[in-house]
Amino acid sequence: MNRSAIVSILSTAILLLAGSSPSYSKELPATEEQALDVRIGTFNLWRSDMGKDEYSWERRRDRLARAIVDCGMDVFAAEEVDTAMFRQLPALVEAKGGNYSWQTFSPYDAEGKGSVKAQAIVYKTDVFEMLDFHRFWCSETPDKMSAGWDDVKFKRGACCATLRHKASGKRIFVMASHFPLGKEARLHFAPIVVARAKEYNPENLPSFLVGDLNTRQERPESAILREWWSDSYLMAWEKVGTRGTFNNHDVGTDMDNAPRIDFVYFRGNGVTPRRYVCNTVKYEGLYPSDHCPVYVDFTINDVPQDGSYRLANENVSVKIGKDGALVSLRNERTGQEYAAGEYMWRLYYDSTSEKEIQVLPSVQNSQISVCGDRISVFYPRISVGGKNLDMQVRLDISLEEDKVRFASSLCNNEPHTVIREFQYPLLRDARIPSDHKLYTSEAGGMLFDDPVKTIGKISSSPYKKPEQVFRQRNVKYGSKVFMNCFGLFGERQGLYFGSHDDTFQDTWHGLRVYRDESTGKYDILEFGFYKYPHCFCGEIWECAANVIAPYSGTWHTASGIYRNWVNTWWDHRETPSWVREMKSWQRVIFKHQYGEYLFKYADLNGKVDASGQSVGCNALFLFGWWAEGMDHGNPDYSPDESQGGDEALKKAIAEYQANGNHLLLYYNGKLIDRESRFYRSGIGSKVCRHDNTGSEILERYKFTGQGTWLGEYDQRTFAVATMMDPEWNNVLFSLQDRAYDLGAQSVFFDQLGYIESESTNWDTSREFPVPDTYGIRKRAECLRLLRDRYAEKAPDFALGAEGTVDALCQYCDYTHGYPANDGPERWINFFRFTFPEIVFTDRGQRDDEDVPRHVNNTILDGQRNDIEIWRCRGIIADTPVYQAYLAQANAIKEHFKDCLMLGRYNDTLGFSSSNPEVDARSFVAEDGERMAVVVANQQTGKPRVISTKVEVSGYRLVDAMMTGSAKVSGTKATLGQFDLAVMLFEKQK
């Protein structure tokens, strides 16, 4: 091929930029080497003979020179460099402090020489030297001066060069082009450009393609280029400026919607696009050209001999292999290795003919680089079943003080597809020590001794999932899952997984065991997070929320990691004192769904109140108080005129609260009875959710009388409201106002403190239907509005909701526990310790079965008691065993309320208990002067008497109360089965 002589026009001033780096030893490990930082870009200068008036060459050339110097590019492609520019512009740039050499290629010269309608590779001479230069034309005969296809009016082409960084000796390959306007010409020229890049860069040096390519991201020629290079706009860590690059010399151009036709592509291991800039700066209020300069700050590192990169500090280290695998995830303090060198992501997409098509990284080609404390893995192209897809994946792994952050960016350019799911990071074949137990925040918290056995259980509906491949535990944040984290907790160390995502988008906690094909056993553990981008062609999705922390110490360290993140968005007001002092409530249905009266308004201040007082309970959670009855007629809630209507109810509430009680008034926050006046008015169908076919989503509640007809055939049917719909908000506001006007001390909205696992709202207007994956955020916004409406007007007017998801309960004064959690894996310690300020109840104790154990759990964990006898059909007096034991428990709570009710839950910290068989917790009073230690014998099986000695350093025992046959002698507690004792310690003076 012909080579042109290098023509240099030098300037004297030096502009210090991110391109100059001192030399370094190539023998050093990659993490210790000096990186090469370089700014590479493109700038179409616009022919000097085209502009008029203020855009004439004589008036804009100074602006253009200033723009070149101000951008400070180390290397850039200049397009439309005509003879007048070539004669004047370099000197103008020099005079303003530039120091550039301009290597031009004119497609109108047989040798490519000269400056007639030329393009140029421009580089700083104090930073780089040019080692070679090549050029070719856009035609069927690219080595001859020619034009081709449907663009014969102009001659087009490309030029390329190898540049050596003077300080470090590193070499890079740069190709510059001004693509044709003709569609056919662009489509044919793109593969020529790729082929010549391969030919002229046989060593596969870091490679860059820059220029005005006269195309769009979604066009086929761009897809061809992305088969070889990566588009820095799609892959850069940071984007500055506008999406559009062509301003059409009009300051009124909407640059965010203007065409993006100027591109900076890159390729190569060790190359990181840190910052993409479209510079829209104006000079004297005008653009210097009809294109904006575009440049990218790159960091280039040498690739280590084994192709892997490692980041480490004193706490944690992570290593990524040359194939993008997670080679190591290590606790540096203990030496525990958790990774096994497996891949760390999966992707699923839909096409028009198939759904949930799996993409695995093991069959992809990756590019890996490191910059500072961040490793980046690029996948410029995705392959599935031998077919290439125009989708890009970027993974950024960075090290923080106590954790590793796993960020990701997805770009979909494949027509008629949507990226549905991205599973990342994945810790496959996890190396878990035998003492590590699996923690999830399901129902407030569960702890499983054997992760493999727990996850490996076959589902209740076998093989609906491909359980011949893996077994999975379904854990979705917000859907009965209180926190967006889980962990593997050992005695002295553990592994914390957190999705620190303040968008509160749908997130699954990936808990799987895969089948080992060599043994047939399901014992290959995998942990991670699953997100749902729904990324259509032409869209980018990003997430930087997911972290993994190999921590040292007890699980309280992991709790601190989560709480530190929570504090960045937590917005919980001071809870009304009456709520904090509430020990229990009676939850009672007055009129049931099918019309039966269980209680009347007159009973509120009669047997209902008397029953509550018998156990020290002064709160009533009132259900079914309206004419239609419980779970019927929502959201009409018609006054029950047969009992005197709202006036009679208001009078009964006033009398109840005058006796020192508190009434909590119930509404459902989302269900719309399809027989209600609200629904039949036409509004209901407008505000309700729709599924992936556009049909209404329905829920049914199968309460029955004593026959079978209701439950089997005649259930009530409800539509489900869309949260944050303005009309539905107004409904909730009016219900809240009505509760306040009735004199209730609290309004409660059922089903607003969590999200459902399936019944989200779908948008069916796009090529593929899309679900709303931000249900938590919308519920949170709704609850915040409800809270704030009465925050100043009536600060003691409390707001409650069912469910205790952290992002939602921050706006509530209390929550009703959902779902019930009373099995052997119950372990709400983590949630309770992380959120000691939250007031929430238990659930599920409905009769006289297993009462002491259940009630003891609520005292140990600082929960309030939800008295829901016979699922709210009865009152506590109907269950004498429960009544008797709860009376003892509430007396203890009242006696030690400064610690148990108003103090801070402190778990097992601050004291010692000599017997690990005894369940023990501590609560510290607000003044820090007293600590209550709760101890209980919760051992099931054959009854045994056990004892423990409790010591609190710097404190002395001053008081104690017990249930059952428990005894306290000194600091020793002796406990029969399901006995409990509370021991109060006071700080020694």
Q: What spans do the regions from the language model cover?
A:
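Acidic/histidine-rich helix-loop elements
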Residues: T42-R61, S139-F154, P180
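An acidic-aromatic substrate-binding cleft motif
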Residues: G41, P550-G629
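Structured beta-strand-rich core segments of catalytic domains in phosphoester-bond hydrolases
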Residues: E79-R171, V277-C278
